[in-house]
Amino acid sequence: MREIHSLFSLSLFLISSSLSVALDYNVITPKEFLKDGDTLSSPDQVFQLGFFSLDQEEQPQHRFLGLWYMEPFAVVWVANRNNPLYGTSGFLNLSSLGDLQLFDGEHKALWSSSSSSTKASKTANNPLLKISCSGNLISSDGEEAVLWQSFDYPMNTILAGMKLGKNFKTQMEWSLSSWKTLKDPSPGDFTLSLDTRGLPQLILRKNGDSSYSYRLGSWNGLSFTGAPAMGRENSLFDYKFTSSAQEVNYSWTPRHRIVSRLVLNNTGKLHRFIQSKQNQWILANTAPEDECDYYSICGAYAVCGINSKNTPSCSCLQGFKPKSGRKWNISRGAYGCVHEIPTNCEKKDAFVKFPGLKLPDTSWSWYDAKNEMTLEDCKIKCSSNCSCTAYANTDIREGGKGCLLWFGDLVDMREYSSFGQDVYIRMGFAKIEFKGREVVGMVVGSVVAIAVVLVVVFACFRKKIMKRYRGENFRKGIEEEDLDLPIFDRKTISIATDDFSYVNFLGRGGFGPVYKGKLEDGQEIAVKRLSANSGQGVEEFKNEVKLIAKLQHRNLVRLLGCCIQGEECMLIYEYMPNKSLDFFIFDERRSTELDWKKRMNIINGVARGILYLHQDSRLRIIHRDLKAGNVLLDNDMNPKISDFGLAKSFGGDQSESSTNRVVGTYGYMPPEYAIDGHFSVKSDVFSFGVLVLEIITGKTNRGFRHADHDLNLLGHVWKMWVEDREIEVPEEEWLEETSVIPEVLRCIHVALLCVQQKPEDRPTMASVVLMFGSDSSLPHPTQPGFFTNRNVPDISSSLSLRSQNEVSITMLQGR
């Protein structure tokens, strides 16, 4: 569909708005003023700067200073978008320092370029203000150095040569912000920016929403993988994507003298307008194009397609099944899909090629920054890390190059018939495709069928025998370990849990469901039941029994016994009536039950529990999966660390190791473990630091979203610390108690020390416990792990990130 846009009324208004003689400048100096009715034009007479009104009928006196295309008329930049002038007495002045200053008739400043610029003012030599032929309003030092330019401060429009992205050195970010309405240029509901977590990707977000609205995807050398319309434009435009340690940006330039602009409108649509030969703006394409373009409409491992009724339809990728059969429809599509056959890294998973896909969300990905790895190199790297779920080339030109790895579920995919990219997904079986045309004979088929039946019968019989043998062997192993651990029979546990009734279901752990139960003597228990289809659960079960059986500490959950029957394995723990920590801190209503005293008690308790594992138990134990969901709370809200299935023990002075099988929870893993498989006691320290920040803020690290930037929780808190800004915390009554604020700030300081990038920089848990118990000065933290230097928002908060003891009722200052 093509649309033609014209605003002749605005043009007529601009011509007639001034009662005095209108002047058209080519250059403005500090000695000159741009009055309402005057204009500043580009050398080629394509762009103009001046005053205009957007609402002639209801608000004709509301005037804006902005840049526009002269013919056909289109506003591309507005200076005072938040603060319109009233009447036609406003004027623009260029100061001797090169600052643009907008005043009303009473000489009150309404806007200045210095308020938007991050550059420090300096003495300017003969500053000039002019418009380039590309539409860039430039304040320059004479004819050379740029003091300020409008291209650094986009509004809702991107012109040829402008950038979208981020300069990490100067902290300059280039993003689009929609207008509120067609007649109100103040910031609207939508922003378009470059997300630099993992492989950079263009994302559209509705302000205030935690998730994306639309993801144009990552750059693959030719276009963004979620914007096929841009791929179709390759003959009209040259696209440029720059990625370095200092800057990541995207820009475009037209071919064949095409005049074009990209506009983010007030409804969240990205429009490409092209000037026609008839001198009109024609809508060339729109993104999102259809409902399937909206973010993760079908959930994990699913693709969206438009059906014959022109409505979205979700389907699982081949080899996957709906996560919830009852809820698998378009209204509940976000539930997504799961593997039909679970992956099992130890049994050498296969990678299956899925062609023509929109690359999944790369927020939690790793990529080859130098773009030098081959696809085979990429496969080897992904295969060596059990947490790697898929891989692909970063650049599809010249046969493909570069490496992109995903960790976690793959979301926001769709299939394209003539667009998209190959993605290689980890599967729990080797997929073999037969493409031959020969017809198999009936005799051969019969023989094969009989052989298959015999093999299946033998396999079932052998499995039954092996189940009994393994169960008995495991039971003997437990007894030989002399663990002094009661072994319950299955009947007792079945009676205690009312045959594992749904009413007694407490939740799902790493390897299976957990049920509440009550023994005959009245003791309440929690039964962790190993899931039958858990590929790695038996080994973790054995590990957990052997590790925790003889551990005794008030901040560790107590193991009461186990149950083994065949390959059915269950752990019986003391029951924690208040569930887990995440049940409280991440819920707005329930979090009010945790005042600061209780939160601090939980922090101290977890610290003492980890210290016991690292230093005071008979073996040095690294938990490897410390998170809010694995901290249980008793009747008095005392914390108890649970779930030792992934823990590793060491004897003597050993305190670190490496593995190819990276397991745990992303968001809590330190970088050296998640990327290289290297873990140590400092891995738990990192997880503990993340947990402390989550307890204080009530936000999850990995799921943290902010309307104004793409930082995770660690990056968000770190930026607030470095810039002496304030941090958001729950609106709780305990924040009104001035006496707790120094303690809260000290906890944040300690947490930042725990999550530092390098393990050798992190304190030991013994040092952490001492830090909490004293008022001694703390070292300055360095940059945390998994931090990328991105945009920092304006925060309204109740704590200033300072660690010294200068206290006031509303704010803390000084570090």
From Swiss-Prot:
Binding site for ATP: L506, G507, R508, G509, G510, F511, G512, P513, V514, K528
Domain PAN span(s) in chain numbering: 345-428
Broad class of where this protein is predominantly found: membrane
Lineage: superkingdom: Eukaryota
CDD domains listed in its UniProt record: B_lectin (cd00028), PAN_AP_plant (cd01098), STKc_IRAK (cd14066)
Enzyme Commission code: 2.7.11.1
Annotated active site: D625
InterPro entries: Bulb-type_lectin_dom, Bulb-type_lectin_dom_sf, Kinase-like_dom_sf, Pan_app, Prot_kinase_dom, S-locus_recpt_kinase_C, S_locus_glycoprot_dom, Ser-Thr/Tyr_kinase_cat_dom
Gene Ontology MF term list: ATP binding; calmodulin binding; carbohydrate binding; protein serine kinase activity; protein serine/threonine kinase activity; ubiquitin protein ligase binding
Annotated region (CaM-binding), positions in chain: 589-606
Modified residues (Phosphoserine): S534, S642, S797, S803
Signal peptide: 1-22
Sequence ranges on the Extracellular membrane side: 23-438
Name listed for the protein in its UniProt record: G-type lectin S-receptor-like serine/threonine-protein kinase SD1-1
Gene giving rise to this polypeptide: SD11
